[in-house]
């Protein structure tokens, strides 16, 4: 009975549908998109459990309907229970930590196991309202700073923490606060600087060239702002 039970279990494992858990910040979520697009070419029955939020899968022609917020009603009972679960980790991919591939390619290797290959750029599908909101923000900042060129600066990663007057990132995925201030001061001579940060940053202001730190909670609007801006610096 034992061998039969083994082969039965193995067969069930090979035919079971899959659930992929994606965690972390916006960069990781966006970087996973090309890998899932590739997976969809051969498997249309997987789901994505969005531990880091599903904002960047919204509006995608194929991934939106496969993506579930981790608070989705009856997620475990209706969607996960009968699936095999995977948590792809691009930072653990050999090609990535040996600097032979991008984060998107590392996701592709972890998810599709097809080795290193060329991928399309990840695309965020935004609606007209989001694009208009981003355009308005950019125009307001240009008017405020009297600058024609706009640079968006995202200095802190998802793992950064605000500790009093300091912003600390134990994983070293963020700029040091002193460097953030220095970069902002250098950039504002030539650009309208927009800082994308949930943490307060004190930068010595000049009356003629202020630095914008808009408190916008919607990351999709931020995506629109970044797309319309002339340059983006991020970590």
Q: What does each model-found stretch correspond to?
A:
Residues 1-235:
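Catalytic machinery of carbohydrate-active enzymes
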């Amino acid at each position: 009975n034992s061998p039969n039970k083994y082969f039965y279990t193995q067969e069930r494992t090979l035919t079971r549908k899959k659930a992929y858990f994606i965690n972390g910040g916006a960069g990781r979520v966006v970087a996973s998109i090309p890998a899932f697009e590739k997976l969809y070419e051969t498997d249309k029955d997987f789901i994505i459990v969005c531990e880091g939020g599903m904002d960047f899968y919204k509006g995608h022609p194929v991934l939106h309907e496969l993506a579930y917020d981790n608070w989705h009603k009856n997620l475990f009972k209706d969607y996960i229970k009968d699936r095999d679960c995977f948590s792809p980790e691009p930072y653990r991919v050999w090609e990535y930590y040996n600097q032979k591939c991008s984060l998107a390619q590392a996701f592709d290797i972890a998810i599709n196991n097809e080795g290193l290959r060329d991928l399309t750029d990840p695309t965020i599908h935004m609606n007209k309202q989001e694009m208009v909101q981003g355009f308005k923000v950019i125009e307001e900042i240009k008017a405020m700073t009297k600058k024609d060129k706009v640079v968006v600066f995202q200095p802190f990663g998802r793992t950064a923490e605000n500790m009093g007057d300091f912003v600390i990132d134990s994983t070293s995925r963020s700029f040091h606060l002193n460097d953030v201030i220095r970069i902002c001061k250098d950039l504002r001579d030539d650009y309208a600087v927009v800082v994308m940060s949930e943490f307060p940053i004190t930068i010595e202001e000049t009356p003629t060239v202020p630095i914008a730190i808009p408190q916008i909670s919607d990351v999709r609007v931020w995506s629109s702002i970044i797309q319309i801006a002339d340059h983006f610096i991020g970590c």
